[in-house]
Amino acid sequence: MSTAELIDDLHPHKPAAAPGGRKKSKPPLALRPLHRMWRKTIDEIQVSALDLPVRGLPEALRGLVACQISDFHVDRDEDLARLASAVEAINQQQPDLIFLTGDYFSGPDTMHRYLGAFRDALKNLRPKSGLFAILGNHDHWSSAERITDALKRAGADVLANDSRRLFIRNEKLMIVGIDDLWSRRAEPSRAFHGVMPDDCTIVLAHNPDTALYAHHLAPGVMLSGHTHGGVVRIPYYGSPIKSILRIGKDYYAGLNRYGNFYIYTNRGLGTFWMRIRINCRPEISRFSLVALAESAHREIPQAKAKRRRRPRHA
């Protein structure tokens, strides 16, 4: 299985200046090439297209299109403009399903400022069969109640240790949403309540480490975010930043197998703490569902040492 194939480069719209606001100063001429490179890694969205192997996928659902975005961190006007561009790009994919996997804001102050505009931007999403969302750690640290309400008003079905049964092309598909791990709200067994052993499931879990506690429930596939792709990506090495995952750095970004199912970790749209990305552009994941070929059992990778409680970057 190859990694994500880049199919499109998208430039976000520039936000309109606020009435009476100051004009943004341009960088010195000598620094403009560096500034353009920095803006490219922060603002130019990459649409990653790939086949997503799903354990137990019915043949009739082969080719179903799903899009995922994560870690919006809408803290500035530029972040809101990037979200608007992402919505437009997702609609161009004509997806059957859209998944939002948490961390919509960084904290309560920016949430209060941008919540209405965030809700209105998401109202423009046009999935054919459903829009589903879960919360991340920053959402619980901001206001889970208010963010959940905004997501619902935008048309999203918000899953918190819950599942939904869909019938698409006359086949059943279960969407399972596990609440955030770092906020100590993840209850995988509760989320899978009512899910039958032979059901095909797409599991949404903000933190890839959730797989450590959910793998025994036999997910069909798991979609996560949280890591921002590692923020800095070095070719043939990955991220040099100290791992915030017990599951390991291999799960920082992209498609990786974990035992008998796959995890896809989206690199996210926004940034937190430091406004930086290096070789790790904002991402929209565009999936075409395929059946995971049955194979011999694979051992579950060993978890690493227990993480510190609340790191500054996530």
Regions found by a protein language model. Give the residues of each.
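Active-site neighborhood of phospho(di)ester-bond hydrolases with catalytic His/Asp-centered motifs
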Residues: 67-70, 97-103, 130-137, 159-162, ...
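Active-site environment of divalent metal-dependent phosphoester hydrolases
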Residues: 74-77, 106-109, 135-148, 159-168, ...
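Core catalytic region of metal-dependent phosphoesterases/phosphodiesterases
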Residues: 78-167
